[in-house]
Amino acid sequence: MAGRAPQHALRVGCRAVPEALSKPAQQSRCLSSTVPRQATYPVVSFNKTSSPELKEALETLREKVILPTYLPPELRQKIFNKKYEKELAHDPVTIQIDGQPQRFSYINMLTDMPNTPKNIRAALLSMKNGGDFANLSGLLEGMHRANRKLPYWLSAQIVRKACKAGHLQLILNMVRDVKRTGFTLERHETVNELLFWIQRFAWKSDYSEPETRKALREVQEILDALEGDERHMSKDRKRQQALTRFPYHRDPQFLAARLNLTAELAARRAVTGQTSEQQLNSANDVKNLVKYAEQLVRLWPADKALLDMYTDEAYVARVDLRYLIKPQVHLRYASFTLQALKNAAKIVGQLGHGPLAAQLINRAAAVEAESQLAYAKVDDGMAGQKIYEMVVGGKK
């Protein structure tokens, strides 16, 4: 295939896919200023942090990138214009922002502006407690005001870091408030990571009914946003959807999250002593499980594993789906998908839908074979291996 590196191929499942060849490209520093938007929200500020490193990273971005967006256009142009450098050194622009006097001297866009991705990542890695993570939405809001676009690799890192620290709801709120935060679901990896964590929190509760229903609502909310909210659409997403051949809201890998949680709820259908409301919920769970399973097998080609569903071109570029070919990453996402297929097949089979169960088993067998190849390539103790062993193998 043209443009594809033949060397260092990593084979996972039935395809040969290119291995990572270099570090992710850093987003270039922005060399132009944007006209400030009307302040419809409070001015971005940050809470007390747990470390001086985090405070420095946040304040650097606030002073150099965020606060200038609140200046009137003519003053903003002035502080970035070199011909006013000496004048501003003696007489800086002083303006009240959110009731506080702010002083602006000349800012050289090439040498004075911080590297946005580097500083955001530094801030993210320095966040330790709830107070630190509470600054995340304001940080992204400020970057959105300044038209700083997150590099392709950073959004999924934000989801992973915050959710690992227990802040799934913070991420979901940023997605809901996308107009303010600019935190979009435009990249395949970001969506995959978010759906993984929603399921993981339900799994950690042993799929208790309240937590599983809550998780199912959150997954459906994500799917609805992917289908109907144009703010989560972009050129990058359109390209990735063309490479996968699925719009995000119909991508089988994403729909498997809904199937997984619905299967866990439907498995409770035979519990005795249910109230009339619980019986109605159980009947709806069973009905939805059959509906979601039928939809999934229509979209998911027979005999195809996860990687085989998408085009070869999807795995060429780092900005697209190459992340999926890393064995331990593949195992993390495949674990809940495989659990969904197996559990759903078992339940619909018990309900008398034999042909549908057989189709689910067909997809499960393909995913399991692919996952076993990935499992053999990871070192003992790696995160992907542990997740796979716990979710699929039932290991505690």
UniProtKB/Swiss-Prot annotation:
Record keywords: Mitochondrion
Entry keyword annotation includes Ribosomal protein: no
Domain of life: Eukaryota
Location within or outside the cell: Mitochondrion
Keyword ATP-binding tagged: no
A GO cellular component annotation in the UniProt record: mitochondrion
Family classification: Belongs to the mitochondrion-specific ribosomal protein mS27 family.
Job description of the protein: Component of the mitochondrial ribosome (mitoribosome), a dedicated translation machinery responsible for the synthesis of mitochondrial genome-encoded proteins, including at least some of the essential transmembrane subunits of the mitochondrial respiratory chain. The mitoribosomes are attached to the mitochondrial inner membrane and translation products are cotranslationally integrated into the membrane.
Complex formation: Component of the mitochondrial small ribosomal subunit (mt-SSU). Mature N.crassa 74S mitochondrial ribosomes consist of a small (37S) and a large (54S) subunit. The 37S small subunit contains a 16S ribosomal RNA (16S mt-rRNA) and 32 different proteins. The 54S large subunit contains a 23S rRNA (23S mt-rRNA) and 42 different proteins.
Protein name: Small ribosomal subunit protein mS27
